[in-house]
Amino acid sequence: KNAKAIIDYQGIQHALNKHGINSPSVKFSKQPPITYKDISNYRDIVKNADETIKRDNRIISYKQVNGHFVVVEQINRNKSEFIFKTMFKEKGDYKNAPDYKKNIKEND
């Protein structure tokens, strides 16, 4: 409830390098790019997520937005700190995404 949200350059750099405008994920898979504005709103996405999956020390939040969805992954370092790891967007319904299906299956 009173956990501290931490975001650092490593998480921002990872999200932009892997899922930003010039990333292979965007160029080759037609994934919508992540922007600095998206990253600045990640806490709102987490707070208003349609679904959140907790696995080991990872927390993965899914938010459906119009014709695409946003995924935010955080690491729970301890009971009171959540560190931004990455975020990405994909077209379609998050429940049909391979990432979601994998996380649900591994969570059982």
Language-model features: locations:
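Ribonuclease/tRNase effector modules and their secretory precursors
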Residues: 1-108
